[in-house]
Structures are given as C-alpha cells and as structure tokens.
C-alpha cells in the first residue's frame, strides 16, 4: 500500500525518487493501485450461504430419491394351496345335545295308539217285502234302530221300486250307512255300526231270506 502511494506521489511530482527514473519506468504508464486482500469477515459472511445451499441441495436430493415399492408376492398355485389347506387341522363342529333333540322330537311326533279290534257284536237281519212305496217308513224305522235290512223289491213294479231305491240311498247317506245290490231287485242296507259278514252276504245272494234273532 505504501509503495503504491509513493508511486502516485512520484507520478504527481510531489516526491522525487531517482529509483523510478531508470529503465523500465515510464511516468505515462498506467498502473492500478494494489488492493488489500479481502478481509476474513467477508468469507465468514458467505459461508452460511454456501452451507445453506448445501443443505438445500441435500434436502432436494432426498426428495428426488425414488422409493422402490415392495416386491409383490406371486400367487400360490392352486395345487399348493389345496395341499396347504389339507395339511391344516380340520375344525371340529360343536356337538349338539342329542338327548335334547330326541326329547323335542318325541314331543312333536304324533302318538299312534294301537288299534283295538273289538269282538263282533251280534246283529239281527230283517227281511222286508214291500209292495207299495208307502212301506218306506217301515224300512227307515228298522234301519234307524241299527238293524240291517234286506229290501226285496221283486213284488213291486219298476216305478215304485226305483222310488224306494232312491229313498234307501238317501237314508243310508244321512245315517252314514251303506247299501249293496245283492240281486236285480234285492238290496242290503247296513247301518254304520254293523258289519255284515261275507258269509251272511253269500247266504242272502243264494236266496236265503230270513229273520235272524
């Protein structure tokens, strides 16, 4: 710095210095003053900026970093999955109370009573030979009393015989009995509480009209 000021003073003629008159010195030469070195505080002032820039750069690098997704597991083949399932212990279903279910079934099941076959009650068959339709009342009275009636219509004309058959059909229907044709004009009327045996029916068909006591 002092050398530069002296050069400037010599150049202006304020100071004489023979050393500058020698060869190689020209007062007309341009020169620049020497600059003092940059103070250290300037470096310290710029250091935080560099450090901040480095921090931002590292943060930017971390943001740009690509995160690879985890590798997906390949699906297990069906045969392998079935083998794995078969190797697992089977779940045991809870055992319900059989006694309780049986008791409930016994309560809900219908009770079937054994059929009791009673002994055949004795019956008496009455044979009637009506000649007119007016005798239908007599047939109805015997049948209502629970007596089987053999109705022989051979002595009646066809018109009255047909009317009497219609009456007998309505009679047995109303009292829940039955009517059977033995021959063309002979009919057996059986009440609901009487079961005429097959043997007696055969005898009636053979012409054995009788009053059985």
Curated annotation (Swiss-Prot):
Keywords: Cell cycle, Cell division, Cytoplasm, Septation. Residues 16-89 are annotated as: Disordered. GO terms for biological process: division septum assembly; FtsZ-dependent cytokinesis. GO terms for cellular component: cytoplasm. Residues 27-39 have a biased composition (Acidic residues). Its main location: cytoplasm. InterPro entries: Cell_div_SepF (IPR023052), Cell_div_SepF/SepF-rel (IPR007561), SepF-like_sf (IPR038594). The keyword Cell cycle applies. It is found in: Cytoplasm. It holds the Pfam family SepF. It comes from the Bacteria. Homodimer. Interacts with FtsZ. Belongs to the SepF family. Cell division protein that is part of the divisome complex and is recruited early to the Z-ring. Probably stimulates Z-ring formation, perhaps through the cross-linking of FtsZ protofilaments. Its function overlaps with FtsA. This is Cell division protein SepF 2.
